[in-house]
């Protein structure tokens, strides 16, 4: 594993360990040094989530962003009806089950 990946994982794990307590760069440095992992000094500062609720961050990982512009309700309803009419017309044409292969 690359050094940057190891450093990043060490910071992430230390932040998760500190989940119930305030996550600060100082506390993360203590945990990382106790684990005998060498990390560049800027990593804990980047991952210090002071003022953020990590529980909310964990819960929102799978949630998506806002939906793209949705069509107006009236326009969407008309499109659905047109599709149904097209399907009915196609099914009537195919009612002979293609027995007259090339009519």
UniProtKB/Swiss-Prot annotation:
GO CC, any one term: cytosolic large ribosomal subunit
UniProt key word Ribonucleoprotein: yes
Query: One GO biological process from the UniProt record?
Result: cytoplasmic translation
Residue ranges under compositional bias (Acidic residues)?
91-103
Q: Per the record's keyword annotation, is Acyltransferase included, yes or no?
A: no
One of the record's GO molecular function terms: ribonucleoprotein complex binding
Compositional bias (Basic and acidic residues) spans?
80-90
Any Pfam family: Ribosomal_60s
Q: What does this protein do?
A: Plays an important role in the elongation step of protein synthesis.
Write out the similarity annotation. Answer: Belongs to the eukaryotic ribosomal protein P1/P2 family.
Q: What is the name attached to this protein's record?
A: Large ribosomal subunit protein P1
To which species is this protein native?
Polyorchis penicillatus (Hydromedusa)
């Amino acid at each position: 594993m690359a050094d940057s990946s190891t450093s990043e994982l060490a910071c992430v794990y230390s932040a998760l360990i500190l989940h119930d307590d305030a996550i600060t760069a100082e506390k993360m440095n203590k945990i990382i040094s106790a684990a005998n992992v060498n990390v560049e000094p800027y990593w804990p500062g980047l991952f210090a989530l002071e003022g953020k609720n990590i529980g909310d961050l964990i819960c929102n990982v799978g949630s998506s962003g806002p939906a793209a512009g949705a069509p107006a309700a009236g326009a969407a309803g008309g499109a659905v009806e047109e599709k149904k009419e097209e399907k009915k017309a196609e099914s009537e044409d195919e009612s002979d089950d293609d027995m007259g292969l090339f009519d």
